[in-house]
Amino acid sequence: MIVCVLDDLLFSVKISTAAKQMGADVYFERTPGMAAARIKEKQPSLAIFDLNSARLDPLGVVAELKSDPETRGIRTLGFVSHVHTETIAAARAAGIDEVLARSAFAERLGEILKE
């Protein structure tokens, strides 16, 4: 199971379509303030974050997950516009496992969902 924390419709459709084709189980959390609780509840193998989402506070959620013994082992991956170098640095400081440019994420989506 993969939990996606994003509110970008384009990427939601891309992920849903790829997951359906591969038979991957994906859950989308779009409710502000609920992402960390949902990830803790679902215990996914991967949590994917749109680091450009101001509404869903992905950096705060990643920091919360990585500071909790119950969730710190969950693999986290974020995608972000490559020009937002401060966001990339902040995500790494929060403890995210991997950060990809939006284009690289879209290109590697099938591979990411298989892992």
Annotate the PLM regions.
Residues M1-L9:
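Conserved acidic segment of CheY-like receiver
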Residues A24-R30:
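Short hydrophobic/Thr-rich beta-strand motif most characteristic of the beta2 strand and flanking loop
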Residues T31-L46:
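Acidic, metal-coordinating helix/loop segments flanking the phosphotransfer/catalytic sites
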Residues K42, K66-R72:
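Conserved phosphotransfer cores of two-component systems
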Residues F49-E64:
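Conserved phosphotransfer microenvironments
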Residues G73-H82:
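A short, hydrophobic beta-strand element within the central beta-sheet of small alpha/beta folds
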Residues V83-E98:
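Alpha4 helix (beta4-alpha4-beta5 surface) of REC/receiver domains from two-component response regulators
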Residues G95-E107:
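Output/docking surface of receiver
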